[in-house]
Amino acid sequence: LTWQVGPDGAITGFEQADCAGEHRFEVSLRQDLATYPTAEFGPDAPMPNQTRQAQLREELCGAGTLRYLSGKYDPNGRYSIAPILPPADAWQRGDRTMLCGLQETDRAGEPVLTSGRVADQDQARVFEAGQCVAVDAANTLTDVPCADPHQLEITSQVSLADVFPDSTPTVEDQDSHLEDVCTAAAQD
């Protein structure tokens, strides 16, 4: 799916898009909240608030999205699992379809344009040598000017896929390999 965001934050042009091209949201599954086992989403029910939407994301979207990605999801990576509810007028007419999917967001948490299917992407947050990175309270990594407060300065990129081509390495295996590699990069 994709859409445009106006200067005032208004969303227009909400439409289906080919995941190979630019888009803001990749649908992983559809949930019909009308079949949810309570009257919470009945014909006269109000739309869920932000807190309830976050709960629904955890309850209904996580496992299905992980299956959609064949188990390959980096929860600390570029993409987050998110729900999209129908517009308010469609909700009032009885539409209870919740779309679960994946999106990449900017610093403000707004979905940004991305290209390609998530399953085919490197999900890691990658920074270039020389960039400085701040870590916020939610452990989100953001590149910042090095004159600003930051916790990391990138000295090198290392592809662990080259070293561990057949499996995901344990944290201990990563640390063992990276100790010498990163120390050498910092000294250079």
Give each language-model segment a name.
Residues 1-188:
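Primary mode marks residue(s) on the alpha4-beta5-alpha5 output face of response regulator receiver
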